[in-house]
Regions:
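Active-site beta->alpha loop and helix N-cap motifs at the rims of alpha/beta catalytic domains
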Residues: 2-130, 134-142, 146-147, 231-240
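C-terminal alpha-helical cap/extension of soluble enzyme domains
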Residues: 2, 7-11, 28-29, 35-37, ...
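Catalytic alpha/beta core domains of metabolic enzymes, predominantly
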Residues: 112-118, 122-218
Length: 242
């Protein structure tokens, strides 16, 4: 698997009748795949995954997996069927932690995850989140996930999570308000929940970013949220407009 440096949530482009706009999604995926960005999160919150159906999520994942190398994709898992869909497509799952009452429930979920799975931890979805204490227990028990997008955490939390998980865990801080500090604290790189990265890959842009914006794998900071790429998506409707 590629060790991702920049994770970008992508949109789900829909027709006015509520069906997947397969032509727009396909063109969007092809354009995204031609950029320098490392990893694309399919059917996440920005992609409307929470409110879409398993059938829609499956079809969108199929479209992306046919056009972008699978090791550059993460399939957001909102329901059990999504996990099977990700396996069918050969895409790494990122499992949303939902409605976990306590640490024991969390550990039960972690114990059942595929070895390459990521987790998506957000207090909006579960009262028990992926904390440093949970992470340390999971690591000692041999059930630590491969990585995770961990939301609503402080810089101290990022440092503690990095210490608890070790260097092999791909840690993504779900906030984008303190990018450099988060990377120094141990995060791999940022995910932007405000929609900015969607503009980076919605694109009328050259495939190669300027040298100073590329992710080389050696940079202390490689995320960019201000490339000169014209958006072609109406974010309110998730439909192509140009």
């Amino acid at each position: 698997m590629t060790v991702a440096r920049v994770m970008v949530p992508v949109l789900t482009l829909m027709n006015a009748n509520g069906s997947v706009d397969e032509g727009a999604c396909s063109a969007y995926a092809e354009r995204a795949g031609a950029t320098w960005l490392d990893l694309f999160l399919v059917s996440g919150t920005i992609g409307g995954g929470e409110s879409s159906t398993p059938t829609v999520r499956r079809r969108v994942l199929e479209l992306w997996a046919a056009r972008v190398p699978k090791d550059r994709l993460l399939a957001c898992v909102w329901a059990p069927d999504d996990l099977a869909h990700a396996a069918d497509c050969g895409v790494r799952p990122i499992v949303v932690l939902r409605d976990l009452a306590d640490a024991a429930a969390m550990h039960s979920v972690l114990a059942e995850l595929p070895a390459d799975a990521f987790v998506y931890s957000h207090p909006n979805y579960t009262p028990t989140t992926f904390t440093p204490a949970v992470a340390e227990t999971a690591r000692r028990a041999g059930m630590q996930p491969a990585g995770g997008k961990i939301c609503k955490v402080s810089l101290d939390d990022v440092r503690d999570l990095r210490a608890a998980t070790g260097d092999g865990f791909q840690l993504y801080d779900g906030r984008c308000r303190h990018v450099a500090e988060s990377v120094r604290a141990g995060a791999a790189l940022m995910c932007d929940e405000r929609g900015v990265p969607c503009h980076l890959v919605c694109a009328q842009a050259e495939a190669d970013a300027p040298t100073e914006h590329r992710s080389t794998g050696d940079d202390g900071l490689a995320v960019v949220v201000d490339l000169p790429i014209a958006p072609v998506i109406d974010l309110s409707t998730r439909r192509r407009i140009a």
